[in-house]
Amino acid sequence: MEHVTVSEEPSATLMYHVERPIFSEAYIDSELLHKRKKTPKPYKLRVAEHLCCSSEKVKSVVFGFLPILTWLPSYPLKEYLFGDIVSGISTGVMQLPQGLAYAMLAAVPPVFGLYSSFYPVLLYTFFGTSKHISIGTFAVISLMIGGVAVREAPDSMFMVNGTNSSLVVNIEARDSRRVEVVVALTTLVGIIQFVLGLLRFGFLAIYLTEPLVRGFTTAAAVHVSVSQLKYLLGVKTARFNGPLSVVYSLDAVLRNIADTNIVTLIIGLGCTVFLYIIKQLNERFKKKLLIPIPGEIIVVIVSTGISYGMLMSENYGVDVVGKIPTGLLPPKVPDFSVFPNLFADAVPIAVVGFSITISLAKTFALKYGYSVDGNQELIALGLCNFVSSFFHTFVVTASMSRSLVQESTGGHTEIAGLLASLLVLLVVVAIGFVFQPLPTTVLAAIIMVNLLGMFKQTRDIPVLWRKSKIELAIWLVSFFASVLLGLDYGLAVAMAFAILTVIYRTQRPKNVVLGQIPDTGLYFDVDEYEEAEECSGIKIFQSNSSIYFANSELYVKALKAKTGIDPEKLLDAKKLQLKYAKRDTEGTKTVNQGSLLKKNAVVLLDMELGVTHEVLNGPQKPKHVHTNGQMTEKHIESESEDEFFLQRLTPIHSVILDFTPVNFIDSVGAKTIKSVIKEYATVDVKVVLAGCSRTLLSELRTLQFFSEPVTPDLIFPTIHDAVLQCKRWRDLPVHPNIH
């Protein structure tokens, strides 16, 4: 019976009172709960329903595959069109220089960055579910691609005799081969992402936890910055890939720093300072500016004009972008023969690209109150990369900087991205050749300034130090592994370490003994809360973890340590007591056998566990004490030898295992708990379980946990039920206020 009582005073606490019997799972299953009867459908009927092709199912599949059909028919022109136009132009203006710059990171000619800023963006408009992210080139992915291209097509493969009988690199042949490798890699990444999307593997992103991703992208920023130093200084060095590539690249730049082109350095530093100032102004006055100041396109146009007018390439030796063909290249089938060499690289690129996209998409979706589908995003990215690869593009993902511009300038839908791609198309078709005199140091400046946001992620370190040491460890391992081992190996190490931290958490959970708050049915950690009082003769143990093969033994060790009850040690002590008692009765003592037995009681001091177990109660006389394996004689009393050895070895008669935090248990864990129940029974301590969820109980039944000596009578829905029943078993009085 249950009723609620509310005091008439305004500040009164709402009270409730429940009167019911003590419930065990045996009673609940037999009397209280009855499962709903469900008639399983025949297998043929289930197959027929699954294969049934109704109009609603077709519509759902089509609309799910082409999300544009869900929002375009109801597109509000008056409210959204102007904002999407402004946003599209702003994003497109930003996408042009970034496409050129990130192509350098991908180790392909700049024009392929423009192709990658058009085709995938156009496709995402039809297949994507996010309204605000900007798909296209991105520094991290471009760098990973470039590493593969340089490995598969190094300069050493394209050495030819120069004019002075010296060996020089055939740039045209090298770039052509690198484009083939990058395009094939993009095709493979697209296939992987598309297949994962069809298999509903959108949940993969959860394994790339935020500290891991932020540490990884910060490390990528270090790699990118180091790779751009040679362009900023105008020195000629080889491109390094793999473990310690950052160290080798820095060493190469420093060895050749005497060859720095001063004009190149001045242009690069000037553009860097200008872009940094513009970035700060845009951030400071973003609420007052209709659109951000397009600093990147300004430096591109101005530096291109100056370079063209002053013939910087010919007169000052400044490296420039070079030939940019006008128009679009015809489609071409990728080179499938290199797939076996690229598969190991394609998997991490596919996963990282998707992780960046879905994290940005979810951020904007949460802000504006709509939902994104992770599986559809995988399909959309896969199609963007796969289809576009036939048109000479490299792998794309969402860009944080462009997405922020697209959102802040009033973008409402994917129409903004569509307009941005059309602006890129206009440049490629009509005026791409204009950017041929553009100094590469300007592109390096654009890249490095855009990395500032990633470097700011180092601010996570003090925050994580205060919040979570384990997450800080993930961040640091991800960062240093990626910096030193390279992005591919670094990501693998970081993911492995993140998984190990999950195992570590389950193996090192918080283990506590619970006590009751007086006059309530609430139980809390006795070490943390002074109001919590242990129940006489009962230990309540809670471990904040599930129980499975990796931590089952640790669970038992923690149980024995926290409760102070080790059945094996208690039984050994009992055997020692018997041995010494027999020796004393057979030896020549000043007291006879009868008087010794009358005065025997035992206190076992288990110094190893740091607790005292009273083995027998009674007036203390000469007795035996077991301390760290040594026996000493003291005085106690007892009635007879039989009574002496039948007394309890510990004042604790019951142990309650709180299973409230346990989400799952495997066969090893179930066997472990069952052995604990049997082991404690040998020293007359009853072990019961409390707080098991219905799912956990179902798992225990499946694992055949309920067989002698374990029965459902030992399982209770709450700790309070278990405490009351344990007291009843020992015929102890139950306080009336805690019924």
Curated annotation (Swiss-Prot):
Gene3D superfamilies: STAS domain. CDD domains: STAS_SulP_like_sulfate_transporter. One of its GO terms (molecular function) is sulfate transmembrane transporter activity. The record marks S401 as: Controls the anion transport. Glycans are attached at N161, N164. The chain crosses the membrane at residues 77-106, 110-127, 139-152, 170-199, 210-233, 262-285, 295-310, 336-370, 374-391, 400-409, 414-435, 440-467, 469-484, 487-507. It comes from the Eukaryota. It catalyses: oxalate(in) + chloride(out) = oxalate(out) + chloride(in); sulfate(out) + chloride(in) = sulfate(in) + chloride(out). InterPro entries: S04_transporter_CS, SLC26A/SulP_dom, SLC26A/SulP_fam, STAS_dom, STAS_dom_sf. The anion-binding site that controls electromotility and associated charge movement in mammalian, corresponds to the central binding site of the anion transport pathway in non-mammalian. Homodimer. Interacts (via STAS domain) with CALM; this interaction is calcium-dependent. PANTHER family: SULFATE TRANSPORTER (PTHR11814). This is Prestin. It comes from Danio rerio.
